[in-house]
Amino acid sequence: MAAAAGIWYALALPALPTVLLGVTAFNLLVGTTEAMWRLYGWRTPNAGEQIAWPDPVPPGREQLAFDLIVPLRDEANVIVDTLHGLMRQSHPRYRIVVSLCDNDESTIEAVRAVVRENLHDNVQRTIRDNRITVIVDHYANPTKAQQLNRALEVCMGDVIGVIDAEDDVAEDLLVHTEALFERTGADVVQGGVQLMNLGRGLDKWFQVHNVLEYFFWFTSRMAFHADSGFVPLGGNTVFVRRGLLEEAGGWPLSITEDCALGVQLSAEFGAKVATAYSAALTTREEVPPSIFNKKVGSLFWQRDRWVRGFLQEFIAGRWLKMPTLRQKALAGYILATPILQALSFILVPTAIIVGLTVPTPIAVALLMFAPYITLGIIVCSQLIGLHDFCAQYGKRASRWHYASLIFLMPLYQLVLSGAAAVAVYKYAVGDNTWYKTGRLAEHRAMPAPEYESAA
């Protein structure tokens, strides 16, 4: 306190300019950190090699057995194509474990239809044994973590993977994953996940922004986290050695069990996480179809759940078990980032308005605009990132998509900030309700078939 008072009087600044300078410093920290994370893959010389998948394990040399858990609830419209895709894996040693709720009749029937089809093919062509194990159980208040842990009870493979209901998974993913385990000696492998639908029409303006969030997360930021030794894992395309997962007690019962598991494995077990990304091996998903519509799938309510999950992990304090002070500070900052970014989004324009309307020193007023330098860097990276995304995935972006990244970014950040505010409020009042993100399979060329429950 004495040092702070000394700086205050040395600068001889009134209270308001001092506060404005503090706000500017905070905004610069948040903006600079975001820019550094998203540019990590470009500015780090060996980043490309670091996140590159190794060559696949040669045929006949596969050693690891994989259990791929697919937790499902109300997913009849998308799961058939997902299971068909998973059954085309080139790795010979894998099993698909589908975890279902007993009252979800339409999804159960859809999965059983695929099982029957697979059994028929086995009889006719004798191409492979049945790959699918179906687990149906009762849950009073079902969560993804509960269904994952129930499926873990029957898993016997060396590695446990998680696949979501609408995922399009590359056929050679597992042979490359085994090669990455072998090359790095990792305990956990996090593969790339990419949202695919850029959005068509004014009502889908937000989708291109969400696509690029994922693009920069998995091409750059995830590698940075792995380097730091602290990785909040993604919800799918994550592979964990079964012994470690069982020692950890399975997935934490959290609304963001993926993040919670990553925190636990990093902080309490010192797990080594390897990450890899390439367009050819990326798991492809869809952006939520709407901003607020809970029935079809909402970006806002999905983000509310994510932010609450990060906030819960931050307050729980398991990240404080990281071994060094630097790692503790970085882990805490990573978990607090959604809240800090939302706060910064509000403070940047507020500080400028106050600085221009209330008498302040000219130098202080000019400094209010400094955070817009990092904002400009982020916008430029968005434009370049969209071009790179389209080049890698064979997509075509319109002028509208590029214009949206420039002119509608504040609106997108307002949506995310609103979700963060709701998340903080819900956490404060002990509201644990959340909304499952719906699927429309907009990332697939053809609409998924619909199944009705058996009579």
Task: Locate each region found by the language model.
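Membrane-embedded multi-pass helical conduit in multi-pass membrane proteins
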Residues: I7-A25, R38-G41, P58, I334-V429
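N-terminal signal-anchor transmembrane helix
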Residues: T32-R93, I108
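Short aromatic/hydrophobic "clamp" motif used to bind/position activated sugar donors
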Residues: I160
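Acidic donor-binding loop at a coil-to-helix junction in glycosyltransferase catalytic cores
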Residues: I255-L261
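Catalytic donor-sugar/metal-binding loop of nucleotide-sugar-dependent glycosyltransferases
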Residues: L253, L265-T282
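Long helical/loop segments within the catalytic core of UDP-sugar-dependent glycosyltransferases
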Residues: L119-D129, I135-V136, N141-G157, E171-I255, ...
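Acidic donor-binding segment of Leloir-type glycosyltransferases
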Residues: M87-V136, A140
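Active-site donor/metal-binding and catalytic loop motifs
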Residues: A276-S298
